[in-house]
Amino acid sequence: MSSSSQASSRRQWCYLCDLPKMPWAMIWDFSEAVCRGCVNYEGADRIELLIDTARQLKRTHVMQDGRSPGPQPGGKHGPAGKEGPMEAGRPPSERYERGRGEYVSARLPNGLPRLEDGGPPEVSRQSPTARRTLVGAVPPNLMAQGLVGAPHGLLTAMPLNPRAGSAALTIPAPMLNEISKRQALSMGLSVGVPSFMAPEFEKEFKEKQRNAEALAELSESVRNRADDWAGRPKPMRDALHTLSGCTPFNVRFKKDHGLVGRVFAFDAKLMVEFELKIFIEYPCGSGNVFPSILALVKHMFHDSQKDTGKVINSGYKYVEYEKRHGTGDWRLLSELLSDAVRAFKEMPAPDALPQPYLDASCSMLPTALCHIGRPTQPRVRRRKASPDPDGAERMSSEELRQHWPLSAYPGIPGHMPATSLASAGQAPEGHGSDPSPITALMSVADNVGTASSKDGPGSSGHSANAGRQNSTSPSPGGGQRRLASRNGEPSAGSSTGGPATVTDQSAVMGGEGSAGGGGAPLCCTICQERLEDTHFVQCPSVAGHKFCFPCTRDFIRRQGPGSEVYCPSGEKCPLVGSNVPWAFMQGEISTILAGDVKVKKERDP
C-alpha cells in the first residue's frame, strides 16, 4: 500500500463539513466526530444542535433516486471499451465522461450517494492534479446567495482543456437539496422548512430555528450590554440594573400553573421609543429562549391547549411571577412590569421586586450558550512591563464591580448552593457570575484602563491573554479553554476540574501585568517581594491584589483539603457585577501546588 493510500485511510470524515480530516484534527467529545474547524467556527455550544439537525435531515431525506449501486467486484476499470457497458447501465443522471487525468472522489461521506470512478482512490484524494479545476454543479442562484459553496465531497471534475467536450457530473435534485440545507444550516443561515420534510419533524425544525434566532439575539444583547447600557439615560440604566438584580425568577402561565419558566435577562430595545426587552427560558432548564412575553404566551397557550385560536395583544396579563420562592406568593407580571416601567418612565415598585431563585436541578442559564468570546473587532495590544499607579487607582474596586451589569458574564453557577441565592438581599449570580476568575479578569483588562498585561511577540505562553489570536505562543490546550468557556464549564470553586481548568490556571499564572509606562514595581500583596511582570496570581476582583506563587501555595495549604479557597488576601472578593465571592477551581489549586514555578525576576535598576 502506498504512503498516499495509507494517509487517506487514516483520514476520517467530519460529520458537519464532510471533509476528510486527520485524526489529530478531529474532536470526539460530541455525539458525532467533528473537526476542530467546525467547532471553532460554530462554537462548541451549537455543535450538538447542528449535529442533531443534520441527523434529522439525513433521516428524512431518503434520496432514493439519488443513490447509486456500490462498487462492483473488481474495482479497477479496464480500457474504455470495457467500461462502456458499465456506463450504459447507469441512470442518465449518473453518467459522466472523464477528461484525461481528471478524477472524481469515489468516496462520499455520511450516507450520501456514492458515485463510481474509474481512477485509483488514492490518486483521486491525494494527487494535486485531481484538484485542478473543480466546479460544483449547483444552481447559480444558490451560489450567488452564498447558500451553497462548493459541495464538500461532491465537486464536479472539469477537464483542463475546455475543448475536450467532457460533460460535468450532474448532481440529482434530492442530493442537491440535502447539500443546500446542510451547508446553510452549518453556516448558521436561516433556511425555510423543506417541503419534503416529514410532518413530525417540521414542528421541531421550526422550533429549533426559532430558538437559534432567539439565542443569537440574546448573544448580541449580552455581548454589547456593557457599552450599550453605559450610554443610556440614568433612569433607564437604573431600571435595567434593578431588574437584572432580581434575575433569575420563576414565571408561570395563569391558566395552567404547571407551565413554568424563568426570566433570566433584561435589556432595552429601540422601537419608536426605548422599550423593555425581556428574555425568558421555558420550560426551566430546557434552553429554549423566548425574547418577548408575547412569544412565550403564544407557546404556553399551545402547550395548554386552551384557547389556541385566541388573539393575544399583550401577554403580561396571562403570566404570573413568583415574588419569593416557596412562599406561594404569585403575582401578575403586569404589576411588576407596568406600561410605565416597560417604557422606562417609572422605576419598578420596590415592594413588587422578586427575589432571585436558581433551581439547583437546572442551574445552567441560557446565557451560557451565548458567543461572548467573539469580539467584533480585534484589538491590537502592546505589552508594557511597568504598572501605572494612577491608572490602578482610577476606579475603586467597588466601582469596578458595579461598572458591568449583572448579566455581563454568562456561566454555570452550579457550584454555588441554592440557599445563597434564595436569601434576601443576595444578588443573583446566575448570569452575573463568570465561568472562571480569569475570564472576569480578562474582561476587566479589555474594558477598563486598569492594570493589564499587554501581549507581544515575546509574551509567555502563560500570559493572561493566552489563547487569543494575537498571541504568538499560546498555552497548551488554549483552544480547549476557549471551548470550555463557551460551553459553560463550572466556574471557580467547582469541584470538577479538567484540562480547561488547568489551562485557566495557566492564564491566572499569567496575571495582569500593567498598563502604565513607569512607576512602582509589581510587588506581592503579602510578602512585598518584587514580582515578575507576567508570572503571578491576580485577583479578578481587586486590581491591587497580586500574589507570588510561594505565598499563594502557603495560603492554600493553610485552608486545609476540601475547603473553598478564596482570595489569598484573606478577603472574600466578589466577582464584578455580583456579590458572590470568587474561589479557586480544584484544577487551579492542583496546578499551583504541583511544584515551584521558578521564574527569573527582573533585576532592580
Curated annotation (Swiss-Prot):
GO terms for cellular component: nucleus. Keywords: Coiled coil, Nucleus, Repressor, Transcription, Transcription regulation. InterPro entries: I2BP1/2_C3HC4-RING_sf, Interferon_reg_fac2-bd1_2_Znf. GO terms for biological process: regulation of transcription by RNA polymerase II. Residues 61-130, 373-517 are annotated as: Disordered. Gene3D superfamilies: Interferon regulatory factor 2-binding protein. Transmembrane segments: none annotated. Residues 200-229 form a coiled coil. Residues 460-475, 492-506 have a biased composition (Polar residues). Residues 92-101, 385-402 have a biased composition (Basic and acidic residues). One of its GO terms (molecular function) is transcription corepressor activity. It is found in: Nucleus. Residues 524-571 are annotated as: Cys-rich. It holds the Pfam family IRF-2BP1_2_M. It comes from the Eukaryota. Belongs to the IRF2BP family. Acts as a transcriptional repressor. This is Interferon regulatory factor 2-binding protein 1. The lineage of its organism: Eukaryota, Metazoa, Chordata, Craniata, Vertebrata. The gene is irf2bp1.
